[in-house]
């Protein structure tokens, strides 16, 4: 290889093996993301007049977690491997083969939030604005897990920080997982948690999340290797970009609608404490 490129560090994707049970770095990253979200949600619930209790945010995050797992798997199969699913419907349940989709997970979380809001007498946007700032850190941890698994790497490049991934061929590639970790995880986290400290109407936080994530993901897709089974649609746009563009549009429209509507207080159930 040409000098100046970085060889992928020798990282064993398995952290610990306990008999037949393997604890993987990828799973640990998601666990860290979930625990951080729970800690942050509890801090927000403890604030005066938050309208939330620790028990309520725990129930919400548990519902959201189920939505992420179920929606992420179903979305991956339908968006990225639909042909394989048609040939083998049981592929949907073969989770050990890997495969999760953020956009599918998002739809799963939206479904979970709709259910939670209806069950607990809350507004959907009140629930969505609560959970949106908790998500980016977990996304960042997930991208770190992708990097440690040497998967979802970027396109071939000659930038000085390019990395030769063990299962990405002999040529150096963009570490697109780290780009996504930085943008979707760190930058979006600070943007949202700065924004919620200001007076803002209901729906604006979740709208900003959709617009922010969609923008960052759309941009990174230009240096991320397209899925081998799909390639580029029309030779210029990836499935990730097709799914992210509506997020940007919907997110911007939500923010415009939220500010025009001007509702700054959520309608809370009678007893929240």
UniProtKB/Swiss-Prot annotation:
Membrane topology summary: Multi-pass membrane protein
Family: Belongs to the Lgt family.
EC number: 2.5.1.145
UniProt-listed GO biological process terms: lipoprotein biosynthetic process
Residues holding a 1,2-diacyl-sn-glycero-3-phospho-(1'-sn-glycerol): 143
Organism: Vibrio atlanticus (strain LGP32) (Vibrio splendidus (strain Mel32))
Gene coding for it: lgt
Membrane-spanning residues: 21-41, 60-80, 95-115, 124-144, 176-196, 203-223, 236-256
Top-level lineage group: Bacteria
PROSITE patterns per the UniProt record, alphabetical: LGT (PS01311)
Main enzyme class: transferase
Name of the protein in question: Phosphatidylglycerol--prolipoprotein diacylglyceryl transferase
InterPro entries with a match to the protein in the record: Lgt (IPR001640)
UniProt pathway annotation: Protein modification; lipoprotein biosynthesis (diacylglyceryl transfer)
NCBIfam families according to UniProt: lgt
């Amino acid at each position: 290889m040409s000098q100046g490129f970085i060889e992928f560090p020798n990282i064993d994707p398995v952290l610990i093996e306990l008999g037949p049970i393997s604890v993987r770095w990828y799973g640990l990253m998601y666990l860290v993301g979930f625990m951080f979200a729970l800690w942050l949600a509890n801090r927000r619930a403890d604030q005066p007049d938050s309208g939330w209790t620790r028990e309520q945010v725990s129930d919400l995050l548990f519902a959201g977690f189920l939505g992420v797992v179920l929606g992420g798997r179903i979305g991956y199969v339908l968006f990225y491997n639909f042909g394989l699913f048609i040939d083998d419907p049981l592929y949907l349940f073969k989770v050990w083969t890997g495969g999760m989709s953020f956009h599918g997970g998002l739809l799963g979380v939206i479904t979970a939030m709709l259910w939670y809001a209806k069950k607990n007498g809350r507004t959907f946007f009140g629930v969505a604005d609560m959970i949106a700032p908790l998500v980016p850190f977990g996304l960042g941890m997930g991208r770190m897990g992708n990097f440690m698994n040497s998967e979802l790497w970027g396109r071939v490049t000659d930038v000085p920080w390019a990395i030769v991934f063990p299962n990405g061929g002999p040529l150096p590639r963009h570490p697109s997982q780290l780009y996504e970790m930085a943008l979707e995880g760190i930058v979006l986290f600070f943007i949202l948690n700065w924004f919620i400290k200001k007076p803002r109407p209901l729906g604006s936080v979740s709208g900003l999340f959709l617009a922010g994530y969609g923008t960052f993901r759309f941009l990174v897709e230009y240096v991320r290797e397209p899925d081998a089974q799909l390639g580029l649609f029309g030779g210029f746009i990836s499935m990730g970009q097709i799914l992210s563009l509506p997020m940007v549009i919907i997110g911007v429209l939500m923010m415009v609608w939220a500010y025009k509507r001007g509702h700054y207080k959520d309608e809370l159930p009678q007893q929240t404490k």
